[in-house]
Amino acid sequence: MKLVEDTDSKILDTKKVSDKEAEEAFKTILTWMGEDPSREGLLETPKRVVKAFKEYFGGYTEDAEKILEKTFGDVEGYDDMVVEKNISVSSHCEHHMAPIVGTAHVAYIPNERVVGLSKLARVVEVFSKRLQTQERLTMQVAQALMTSLDAKGVAVTIDAAHQCMTMRGIKKENATTVTNYFLGEFKKDLSVQNRYLRFISK
């Protein structure tokens, strides 16, 4: 299985550019916008934006594989799908850096071992907190789970609104995008895939 090319398995060195340098860059952007970064209301804005960006894009310093390292084998033979629905997604598109807001559904079929339920949501969060396309985000979550858990199958669905479509450009406020990615049994067996789709539609 070819993994999605990107920073999906790399931890970036965020210290190559200092916070101070990033703050100066935001001051330049404020000036370009026609603002005065020295006025009272904006004095702390560059520092606040840098702090916010560390939260928005914290996924560049996190490793999904490490999150999934701890698994549990005492599942008494459970071999059916595990589905976690309605995981909040907050990301930013890589084209306009506009917010992507929506919901993810994740399922996997364990191969003797399971992972803590919160870890599924954390993997979604790690890849969401990077500049993304929704298609790549969906694939990265699925591939990380499939590889790290050695699962029999993985399914990921994301339903999200892109503010690059709702607030600018075509400005279609009610438009949402749905992406699905299936691996293993979910891809090979349509009955398994359809069962998953029924689960998440309830």
From Swiss-Prot:
Pathway: Cofactor biosynthesis; 7,8-dihydroneopterin triphosphate biosynthesis; 7,8-dihydroneopterin triphosphate from GTP: step 1/1
InterPro entries per record: GTP-CH-I_C/QueF, GTP-CH-I_N, GTP_CycHdrlase_I, GTP_CycHdrlase_I_CS, GTP_CycHdrlase_I_dom
Keyword list, A-Z: GTP-binding, Hydrolase, Metal-binding, Nucleotide-binding, One-carbon metabolism, Zinc
Single GO cellular component term: cytoplasm
Binding site for Zn(2+): C93, H96, C164
The keyword ATP-binding appears for this protein: no
One Pfam assignment: GTP_cyclohydroI
BP GO terms, sorted: one-carbon metabolic process; tetrahydrobiopterin biosynthetic process; tetrahydrofolate biosynthetic process
GO molecular function: GTP binding; GTP cyclohydrolase I activity; zinc ion binding
E.C. code: 3.5.4.16
PROSITE patterns: GTP_CYCLOHYDROL_1_1, GTP_CYCLOHYDROL_1_2
Catalytic activity entry: GTP + H2O = 7,8-dihydroneopterin 3'-triphosphate + formate + H(+)
HAMAP family, alphabetized: FolE (MF_00223)
NCBIfam families per the UniProt record, alphabetical: folE, PRK09347.1-2, PRK09347.1-3
Family note: Belongs to the GTP cyclohydrolase I family.
UniProt-recorded name of the protein: GTP cyclohydrolase 1
Organism of origin: Pelagibacter ubique (strain HTCC1062)
Gene transcribed to yield this protein: folE
